[in-house]
Amino acid sequence: MGTRGLALALLAAVLLLQTVLPAASEAEGLVRIALKKRPIDRNSRVATGLSGGEEQPLLSGANPLRSEEEGDIVALKNYMNAQYFGEIGVGTPPQKFTVIFDTGSSNLWVPSAKCYFSIACYLHSRYKAGASSTYKKNGKPAAIQYGTGSIAGYFSEDSVTVGDLVVKDQEFIEATKEPGITFLVAKFDGILGLGFKEISVGKAVPVWYKMIEQGLVSDPVFSFWLNRHVDEGEGGEIIFGGMDPKHYVGEHTYVPVTQKGYWQFDMGDVLVGGKSTGFCAGGCAAIADSGTSLLAGPTAIITEINEKIGAAGVVSQECKTIVSQYGQQILDLLLAETQPKKICSQVGLCTFDGTRGVSAGIRSVVDDEPVKSNGLRADPMCSACEMAVVWMQNQLAQNKTQDLILDYVNQLCNRLPSPMGESAVDCGSLGSMPDIEFTIGGKKFALKPEEYILKVGEGAAAQCISGFTAMDIPPPRGPLWILGDVFMGPYHTVFDYGKLRIGFAKAA
């Protein structure tokens, strides 16, 4: 072959490679982790276990999204219904683990080979320090309390492989105790937190920070695409270093991070069927949390949503007592333009001006002793009063008569979310259910019934549950919404660490 022939052959080879390989500008700095999705499983989900006719004390009982101390949001997390997982490696050579990539926490932990007395450890992959040439001993004790379980162990250091990246000298927790059923039935081995270092247990530097420090990503941005259209197989993708335009439609709406720790931002009004609930008209805090499968919000609003979608609820005797004994008095105070947050204290149902005397105990679960609080469950009459004020205020804004308002609030007393965290709905009624809209960055983000109703099982045995669950965070951190996978599925989500902002766009 002559020189010209060789040149032509090389040119043809280059052109062929360009057709089969992505352009360097597209692939450079982007690390893709495929996510697997599993359907919600009747055996592992938290069942309601209650019929709509049962009377329950308001906010009492075993709510899986609430810790005994009413403490940090991490301590409220419920991984029982987790659906999206990815694979990482720890050590050299890499030992494989399936993890939840969780923007609502900041630590990496995996089961340890030295976990001898927890059955959960024997059902999952376990880290063997002696099998890794890059292991470094640390030994500092660590523990994390979640809403539906806990882990304890100690810190170690090793290389962590995420996609094609190798993060060196990463601190992580070797879990030697995994009590309870949560991690026993879990389909994942551990959790990789993508929150801020401010909430990291033991002040360990999160994996994401190490990626940036070691120059492993070109841009300090990661993004989530959760595929909600499949039951199994391709569940989506998390991309470190940027985003893939194929995963979203249009432009992202960005909002600034308002408080580092969680990916927290300010959210505006919540609308049900196009009508304001009034609860967040003046603004609410929200966090984008990939480690939460449902969408959690204040009980007062979740109850209104339940009523509109026909979700089975539980009857609250405290709520009904408020309506019958204090309803007219509350209405009169609202009509007299009394400051709403002061009403429940004026009628003698709350200790302070609309607060419950709860400590500001929303904090990181680090090395401190748990913060004790008299919390929401200690004063159900105060909680019921505060909800009634919200409901009545909203109805007055719609110019409803006093009789209609009292009747409506009494109906809501029959629709309170189950203490077990889930509410069943009629699978055949999706067509009559309203859209639920969240105002973010001045734009409305709607969830359609088929997006917020989750189907469990198939055929005649199928059940449908609401994707909304109640969770009350007291001031100063709350009221707070947690936008989990129910929201992040329909909306591609960008976590921009460099500019401290979060972006949402319609998922492709």
Curated annotation (Swiss-Prot):
Heterodimer of two subunits (29 kDa and 11 kDa) processed from the precursor molecule. A large enzyme (32 kDa and 16 kDa) is an intermediate precursor form. It comes from the Eukaryota. One of its GO terms (cellular component) is vacuole. Residues 28-66 form a propeptide. GO terms for molecular function: aspartic-type endopeptidase activity. Transmembrane segments: none annotated. The record marks 377-378, 421-422 as: Cleavage. Residues 1-27 form the signal peptide. This is Phytepsin. InterPro entries: Aspartic_peptidase_A1, Aspartic_peptidase_AS, PEPTIDASE_A1, Peptidase_aspartic_dom_sf, Phytepsin, SapB_1, SapB_2, Saposin-like. CDD domains: phytepsin (cd06098). It is an enzyme of class 3 (hydrolase). The active site is at residues 102, 289. Keywords: Aspartyl protease, Disulfide bond, Glycoprotein, Hydrolase, Protease, Signal, Vacuole, Zymogen. It is found in: Vacuole. Its EC number is 3.4.23.40. Involved in the breakdown of propeptides of storage proteins in protein-storage vacuoles.
